[in-house]
């Protein structure tokens, strides 16, 4: 019975693998997009950003300056250490944890072995 199920799985896998392979009957690949031949367009001048105000005279705001390169000096108010909440478990607790996992796996293995023996005849 197990052999028949295994063969069925192998046949289904082979059929799926053959179906996913590319064949000579596949649709041709689409044509490549034509190369663009745009002429270079100069960048527009800095726009005039008007600040909104209740005053009748609107004055354009100056363009933003480029950011200065990062300095490696003081970070000002952000110099505190980041708190660390993750600590190492003591060795004894870690050893007990691994022992419990091993015992649980052993118990599961013995249960499955016992169920297999009960179904057999001597």
Swiss-Prot record:
Location of the protein in the cell: Secreted
Tagged with keyword Signal: yes
Main location: secreted
Task performed by this protein: Major early eggshell protein.
InterPro entries the UniProt entry points to: Vitelline_membr_Cys-rich-dom (IPR013135)
Signal peptide bounds: 1-19
Alphabetical UniProt keywords: Secreted, Signal
Protein name, per record: Vitelline membrane protein Vm32E
Single biological process term from Gene Ontology: vitelline membrane formation involved in chorion-containing eggshell formation
């Amino acid at each position: 019975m197990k052999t028949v199920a295994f063969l069925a799985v192998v046949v289904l896998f082979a059929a799926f693998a053959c179906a996913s392979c590319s064949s000579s009957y596949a649709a041709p690949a689409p044509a490549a997009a034509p190369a663009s031949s745009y002429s270079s367009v100069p960048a527009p001048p800095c726009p005039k950003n008007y600040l909104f105000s209740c005053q009748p005279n609107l004055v354009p705001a100056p363009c933003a300056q480029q950011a200065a390169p990062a300095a490696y000096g003081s970070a000002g108010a952000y110099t505190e250490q980041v708190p660390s909440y993750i600590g190492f478990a003591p060795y004894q607790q870690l050893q007990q944890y691994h022992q419990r996992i091993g015992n649980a796996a052993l118990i599961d293995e013995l249960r499955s072995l016992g169920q297999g023996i009960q179904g057999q005849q001597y």
